[in-house]
Structures are given as C-alpha cells and as structure tokens.
Amino acid sequence: MANDSTTVPTPTRELAERLAEIVGPRGVLQRPSELVVYRSDGLPGYAKQPQLAVFPRARDELIAIVRLLAERRVPFVPRGAGTGLSGGALADGVVLVGLNRLNRILSIDPVERLAVVEPGVVNVALTRAATPYGLHYAPDPSSQAACTIGGNVAENAGGPHCLKYGVTLNHVRAVTAILPDGEIIRLGNAAGEADGYDLLGAFVGSEGCFGVALDVTVRLSPNPPAVRTLLADFMSIGAAARATSAIIASGIVPAALEMMDGATIRAVEASIYAAGYPVDAEAILLIELDGLAAGMDADTARVEAMCQEAGARTIRIARDEAERARLWQGRKKAFGAMGRVSPHLVVQDAVIPRTRLPEVLASIREIATRHGITICNVFHADDGNLHPNIGYDANDPDEQARVQTAMREIMATCVAAGGTITGEHGIGLDKLDYMPLIFSDESLAAMCRLREVFDPDRRSNPGKVIPIHSCREWHAAPKAARGV
C-alpha cells in the first residue's frame, strides 16, 4: 500500500506527524484505503471523506489532540462506534477523533448506584459490569452490543425500555467535557441536582457539536424482581395499535411495548436472528412488564385481556430467560435482518401521538405503494416513535430518487399528525432539511447562538443539527470541511 501514501497532501501529513507524537504512529490513519470504513456510519447512504483519523488511548491524549486541533483551527468529528443512523459522525475534510479506545469503567458505586465511565465504554458492557451488584444501565438502543456511552450522550439515545425508564438524559448525572477550544468543563453533579442553567441538558443530545466527553457519570437502575415478556400477534396493524392504546390508557406502564409489521417479521424470520415470530401475522406486539412479583400475575392477565379484546390471534408468554432473550433478539436485530432484503437501507425516526398510529401507518403504506418501494416498520409503539425502514439500491438513481421523495413525504405526514422528526437517532445530515418543518427561522437562529457559546468557531462536528443556510458555520468553515 506504499503508493497509497502519495495521495495524502503535505499539510495532512504534517498534521498526522503532530498527532502521531501524541498517540503513536499506529494511532493515526491517513491513507484513503485506511479511512474507507470511517466514511459513513450505520446509515451508509451518506459518505464523507475525513482527512485523518486519530485514536487516543487515554484522557490526556484526547485533551492534547483537541488542543492541537484548536491551535491549528482544524475542524473535527468525535466518533464512538459509528452505529448512528443519521449520518452524524462524519464530514468531509475533518480529523475524525475515534473514542472507542477510551473504554475504561472508572468506578461503580453500588450504594449510590452510580458509575463513572470513559466515552468509549460499550453500552452493554456497562450493564454486564453492574450485574454482580444487581444493577443495570437502563437505556438500551438496539445497537447496545456495539454503541458507546459517549455516542449515546451525543444522541440522547433511547431504546425499547425508555417509556418506563427514560432516555439517556434521565440517566446522566454529570459530564466532564473538553470544549473545542481546549477548555475543560464539568456539567452537572453526582447528586443529580440542578444548579443554575441546565447546561448538562444542553450538552446531552448536542450530537458532538458542543465538545467531547472525557468522562460520564451515569445512574444505574436496580434489576426488577420480576419480569414477564409477552408476544401477541394480530392480523392487522390497526388491531395492534388499538391494543397499544388500551394498555397505556389502563394505567399499566410497560417496561417496553414494541410493534413490528408483517414485512419486518418475515425479514427477521428469514435471517439468522429468527425468533419464532408468526410469519403470517400482519403485526406483533412485544410487551415487557416488570416490577414486584406480587402484582405481576394480575398485570399480565390484564394485558392479555386487552390484547384479546383488540383482536390478538395468539398470546405467548416467555417461559424462561432463554426464550425471553430469543424474542428480544429478533427485535434488536431487525435492522440487521433487513440487510438481506436490499443492499442499502435508510431508517427514519419520527415520533407521532399514539392515537394516530393506524392512520399514519396506513399513509406510509400508501406512500410505499405509490413510489414502488418496500417499507418495513419496527418501532416503539408505547411512545409512538416510528422507525420506517426503506430498502433500496443506491446504484439505481431512479430508485434512490423515489426513496428520497418517499422519506420527505413520510416526515411531512408525521409532522402533520402532530409529531416531530426524530425521537432518538438525532438530526445528523439525514434530517437537516426537515428542521424547518418544526422550527421557525428565529428558533434555528437561537440554536446557532447557543452552539456558538460552546464552539464559537463551529469546528466540532461541522454541518450538523442546524441547516447551514440558518447558520454562519457554512461560510466560516474551511473549504476542505465544506467539501468544496
């Protein structure tokens, strides 16, 4: 690959040498062939070419990197595991700062139920480390086997259990962060009490635009004494939606309530992630109840009755932990299973009122038919967080154009139903053009001003969250970072 290095510009090589002094030569990638895997995240339809990638192994190295980039006014993108679904952790011409080697769990306090972790700690690894204490980390995105706590903080990630337990912000007590200019700040506190303005709340969900987390203090949750997992199948989406509304209206708060449509069911069952879902069903609900053992039987019976009244064909209760894990594997791996259906996949993330589920899902089916595309739906029914999955071939310009049109129509439909454009995947590049659907120019300008408090030069993850025509960032960024 020696010839490949000749394509690296001299300024880039000089910067790579400075970075190598911090992390060692094996911690810097600069050849185009080495950077291929960092051109996109979990949404491969967006691809951007970084000029370099650097991988700090320790907190001091990360601090030195950010300060060097500040000194040279170089734009950068913090990146965790690259599992995001909004084109968030990529940009042309930037230095990509990979955080996956900062993966130490610094402390676990089982009495206070707190953990302090570095940003590269994998989500599920934290739960495994807390298990001996009877604790777990509640936010559980479908990518929890790979995604990092730092990435979860950037996106304010949720997961199937967020209705009852909350999203990432509800579990983050404090963040130590380095701002793009190299200043180190502490946001929040271990006690979880707000002092002054809620800057921690601003940082969580800022998509890497405000700086980089050095460590995160999170709240751990006690494992519930009893868990019951049910699978109900229906012959119509409307019946499953009615069951969802009935359960929530009853006062029972499920730990999770997930819906999958027939197309998704069949994709999962045809894959290595087959979970035993009925392939002739038009919809299934995966319902999980947890809490005190004393009331579990009664709540389970009530949920069963509501599903039957709504038209459930069969209801199955997991007999043991192995069966429960298998049912959840099908749901958690659904996006991966759809990779067999088509070479490319785009996933949307709109949120609508639960009561509008039947009509919005019917509209999505009509949009799919009209544009000649396949849309699979798998989502958090309990809070109306839809995840329409559209399979397509990016090498077919006509199909790609139809998919883009369909996505715009889906987003407009969800907003018209009283919803919003994202629940947990973030804005990234994917939803920039949809921001004016829900925010006025004045609101977008206010967001720009907030960003400039943390990052006046707008070098940290440039071109994200706020449409560029609403912000000075596009005009201030170096041409290399703008792809021109």
Question: What do these predicted ranges mean?
Answer:
Residues 30-39, 218-222, 228, 232-406, ...:
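C-terminal substrate-recognition/cap domain of FAD-linked oxidoreductases
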Residues 86-103, 131-135, 158-169, 216-222, ...:
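A glycine- and small-aliphatic-rich helix-loop capping segment at beta-alpha/alpha-beta transitions
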Residues 1-67, 83-113, 264-274, 320-347, ...:
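N-terminal flexible segment immediately upstream of the FAD-binding catalytic core
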Residues 104-258, 476-484:
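FAD-binding subdomain of flavoenzyme oxidoreductases
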Residues 24-25, 415-427, 451-452, 456-462:
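Alpha-helix capping/hinge segments and adjacent helical runs
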Residues 183, 433-484:
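Activity-critical C-terminal alpha-helical subdomain
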